[in-house]
Amino acid sequence: MLIIPAIDLKDGQCVRLKQGIMEDATVFSETPETVALHWLDNGARQLHLVDLNGAFAGKPKNGEAIRAIVEAIDGRIPIQLGGGIRDLETVEYYLDNGISYVIIGTAAVKIPGFLHDACYAFPGQIMVGLDAKGGKVAVDGWSKVTGHDVIDLAKKFQDYGVEAIIHTDIGRDGMLNGLNIEATVELAQALTIPVIASGGVTNLDDIRKLCQVQSEGITGVITGRAIYQGSLDFKEAQALADQLDSAK
């Protein structure tokens, strides 16, 4: 089980939002590359970047900060990136410039054929971010909830050849009130590709609970506010996950 630190970028800074609301941002650092190196030094094996401005604008907006992070990490661990990726040119640009996995969210739902084409052009490098509220998929930086069922859509995307599904429970993201483990397990059970959990990780107890169900196909968990505010110690979390892995 991978514990994956999140670096959310807004106006070139590392921030955390509550429930995806741009106006409710806490700035944690003005130099995101320093944050990336901090997690690398603490044993992170993958990083999760989000271009928040990009997610709302529908096109890349934090290019400078992303470049700085890629240069600082220098290929030592994989970087996954989402936010504002709505065309193949952007996918190709990021994958050619040090990003290991591109995460497609809104565009997977709203632009017919785009996800399918991306998976075909860049096999093994496309993940889908499914943001859920009450089992329905939300789009446009979480500002709109659609009628699409999360599991139905995930199955369809699995057939396209996506590498993994990142499942975020919007109601819990940035709120530090525990993961929606039931919904994540339900999704993982319906799929054969890996599911990465996200939204609401609070403490080691959440990591322990998630590790107990990882055999359902949950391969990682993305954490943000908890590791920045200190309710979860990143090193301890990864050590616990490794310990529970080896005990199996």
UniProtKB/Swiss-Prot annotation:
GO process annotations (BP): L-histidine biosynthetic process; L-tryptophan biosynthetic process
Protein name listed in UniProt: 1-(5-phosphoribosyl)-5-[(5-phosphoribosylamino)methylideneamino] imidazole-4-carboxamide isomerase
A cellular component annotation (GO) from this entry: cytoplasm
Assigned protein family: Belongs to the HisA/HisF family.
The EC number(s) this enzyme carries: 5.3.1.16
Superkingdom to which the source organism belongs: Bacteria
Family annotation (Pfam families): His_biosynth
NCBIfam families for the chain: 1-(5-phosphoribosyl)-5-[(5-phosphoribosylamino)methylideneamino]imidazole-4-carboxamide isomerase
Catalytic activity: 1-(5-phospho-beta-D-ribosyl)-5-[(5-phospho-beta-D-ribosylamino)methylideneamino]imidazole-4-carboxamide = 5-[(5-phospho-1-deoxy-D-ribulos-1-ylimino)methylamino]-1-(5-phospho-beta-D-ribosyl)imidazole-4-carboxamide
Keyword Isomerase: yes
Location(s), subcellular: Cytoplasm
Known pathway: Amino-acid biosynthesis; L-histidine biosynthesis; L-histidine from 5-phospho-alpha-D-ribose 1-diphosphate: step 4/9
Active site, renumbered: 8, 131
GO molecular function, one term: 1-(5-phosphoribosyl)-5-[(5-phosphoribosylamino)methylideneamino]imidazole-4-carboxamide isomerase activity
Main location: cytoplasm
Organism of provenance: Nitrosomonas eutropha (strain DSM 101675 / C91 / Nm57)
Keyword field: Amino-acid biosynthesis, Cytoplasm, Histidine biosynthesis, Isomerase
